[in-house]
């Protein structure tokens, strides 16, 4: 009997390949993230002491008691070690992005220092009660970013604040993307092994999923689109998981809560992905109710808080605030979504506001590699070679399903239906041309290539291998761009400035940071708290209008802040 696109039902040999070890570690990672954010929410909203530490230990002890120490002790320890490693690594360099410094990092620090969004729904009201220099009125009064700190979904901030409470630095919150990438890779191995028939093939597929350009480009930042992608991919894998057990459901439920807590569009994605999950996994009503209650508490701010306050549930994204305004030329903002998606997919990789023009798939023009490493690349944001991989994927899936018998078995129908659904979801967002908003497209391409890899059709298999090789080279180009961006923004213009300040600092000096308001908090916090400089003053200047004058110029920190040193 010939193989179908998805392969036949798993035989005992394949079942043995599907080790539970990767699945358990992935589950432990998701559970640990949920326990940390739930614990920090209990601490923040209800004032309970140290629940972000007590909950993981209590859950671990209960799990080991019921399931046995041999099955879960090592996965739990590995999960803790991976979270610690990701947090330590993330804290070694600065997040130099606008969004990270505008609201992600200030909100994380504020939650760590006692801000409760329920008792002080407007962040600035709480900031006015603080004496620290980074809450100064010169930074926050009239700062339009107050509304994002006050009202944006805060799961990543709760995670970062829990890490800070545990002793990690303020940059450790960016570890969430890395932790979810670990979970995605491990769970991918477990799910894809029976689908592809061989463990090494599953490792290849899991690696392609876990090294998506969006994840790579945002790993060194506090952006949450990469983490959203990982949560979406985990939920998709749960729908494909042949094991109908509790572990797969935990990963799916946890991923749905995480994506809804990362951003408002994540809540929309979660609702749309919950449909196939509920249809395929068929959890009990008791299970649904339990997870719904957990989600309602963890996500109570901002969603329930907004309902109680009479605000639109997704404020400030909804209402009079036009988030996408001026983010691209009108033809991209107002055009047909399928057309704008195609125009971006086959464009030069670029972060310009105007469309950079179309190119032949496979061509790599000047500046595209550098643009691919930027966290929020607008056009062709999945990398310079993704358009070529997309074209090859379309041919591979056509070759794999051209004969009726090769698409008629249940696993293949499930995969094709899910791929079609993901392509449809790509058009749900108002800006499908912006890669960071459409995680479904990349997942659909990878799954289509993996499915074609098991086709009995030689052309389909050959095209699949070619497509995966193109994706691998594309990942290499994106990583090169990420390295350049991170080195320039977080090393040359951050660590180097820190070294100069440390070398020349005297106790009777004053450090002056000149910057727009959106980065004022981060600059003052970094130099006063992290570098422990007693005298730090903030001076507002429009971007690009800074000048040290007669004071010593110590450099341009994260390419946004002029640092001056004044001597008496």
Question: Which role fits each region the language model picked out?
Answer:
Residues 470-528:
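Membrane-embedded, lumen/periplasm-facing catalytic core of multi-pass transferases
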Residues 287-373:
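Membrane-lumen/periplasm interface segments of specific transmembrane helices
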Residues 37-44, 205, 248-264, 270-277, ...:
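Membrane-interface alpha helices of multi-pass inner-membrane proteins
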Residues 1-72:
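Membrane-embedded, hydrophobic transmembrane alpha-helices
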Residues 166-181, 217-220, 351-415:
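Membrane-interface anchor segments at the N-terminal boundary of transmembrane helices
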Residues 74-82, 247-257, 268-277, 287-297, ...:
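Signature aromatic-anchored transmembrane alpha helix within multi-pass, membrane-resident enzymes
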Residues 33-37, 61-64, 162, 172-196:
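Transmembrane-helix motifs of polytopic, lipid-linked glycan transferases
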Residues 53-56, 106-109, 225-231, 259-262, ...:
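Hydrophobic/aromatic-rich transmembrane helices and adjacent perimembrane loops
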């Amino acid at each position: 009997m010939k193989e179908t696109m998805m392969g036949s039902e798993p035989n005992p040999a394949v079942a043995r390949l599907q080790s539970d070890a990767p699945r358990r570690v992935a589950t432990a990672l998701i559970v640990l993230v949920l326990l940390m954010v739930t614990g920090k929410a209990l601490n923040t909203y209800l004032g309970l002491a140290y629940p972000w530490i007590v909950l993981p230990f209590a859950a671990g002890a209960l799990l080991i008691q019921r399931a046995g120490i041999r099955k879960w002790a090592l996965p739990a320890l590995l999960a803790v070690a991976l979270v610690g490693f990701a947090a330590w690594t993330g804290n070694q360099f600065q997040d130099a992005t606008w969004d990270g410094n505008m609201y992600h990092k200030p909100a994380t620090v504020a939650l760590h220092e006692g801000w409760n969004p329920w008792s002080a729904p407007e962040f600035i009201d709480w900031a006015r009660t603080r004496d620290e220099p980074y809450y100064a009125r010169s930074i926050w009064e009239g700062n339009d970013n107050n509304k994002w700190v006050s009202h944006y979904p805060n799961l990543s901030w709760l995670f970062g604040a829990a890490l800070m409470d545990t002793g990690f630095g303020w940059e450790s919150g960016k570890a969430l993307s890395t932790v979810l990438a670990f979970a995605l890779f491990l769970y991918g191995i477990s799910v894809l092994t029976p689908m592809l028939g061989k463990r090494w093939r599953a490792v290849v597929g899991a690696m392609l999923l876990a090294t998506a350009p969006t994840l790579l480009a945002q790993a060194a930042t506090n952006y949450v689109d990469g983490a959203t992608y990982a949560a979406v991919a985990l939920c998709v894998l749960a729908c494909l998981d042949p094991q109908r057990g509790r572990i797969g459901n935990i990963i799916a439920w946890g991923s749905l809560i995480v994506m809804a807590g990362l951003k408002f569009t994540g809540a929309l994605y979660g609702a749309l992905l919950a449909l196939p999950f509920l249809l395929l996994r068929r959890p009990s009503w008791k299970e649904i109710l339990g997870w719904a209650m957990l989600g309602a508490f963890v996500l109570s701010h901002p969603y329930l808080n907004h309902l109680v306050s009479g605000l639109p549930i997704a404020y400030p994204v909804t209402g009079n605030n036009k988030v996408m305004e001026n983010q691209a030329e009108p033809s991209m903002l107002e055009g047909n979504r399928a057309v704008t998606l195609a125009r971006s997919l086959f464009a030069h990789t670029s972060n310009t506001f105007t469309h950079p023009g179309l190119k032949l798939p496979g061509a790599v023009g000047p500046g595209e590699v550098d643009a691919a490493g930027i966290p929020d690349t607008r056009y062709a944001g999945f990398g310079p070679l993704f358009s070529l991989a997309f074209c090859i994927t379309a041919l591979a899936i056509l070759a794999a399903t051209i004969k009726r018998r090769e698409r008629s078995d249940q696993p293949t129908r499930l995969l094709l239906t899910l791929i079609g659904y993901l392509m449809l979801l790509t058009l749900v967002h108002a800006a499908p041309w912006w890669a960071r908003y459409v995680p479904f497209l990349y997942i659909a391409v990878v799954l289509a290539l993996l499915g074609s890899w098991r086709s009995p059709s030689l052309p389909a298999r050959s095209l699949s291998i070619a497509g995966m090789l193109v994706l691998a080279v594309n990942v290499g180009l994106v990583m090169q761009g990420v390295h350049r961006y991170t080195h320039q923004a977080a090393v040359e213009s951050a660590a180097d400035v820190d070294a100069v300040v440390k070398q020349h600092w005297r106790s009777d000096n004053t450090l002056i940071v000149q910057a727009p308001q959106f980065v004022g908090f981060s600059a003052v916090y970094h130099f006063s708290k992290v570098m422990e400089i007693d005298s730090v003053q903030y001076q507002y200047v429009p971007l690009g209008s800074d000048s040290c004058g007669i004071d010593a110029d110590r450099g341009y920190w994260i390419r946004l802040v002029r640092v001056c040193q004044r001597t008496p």
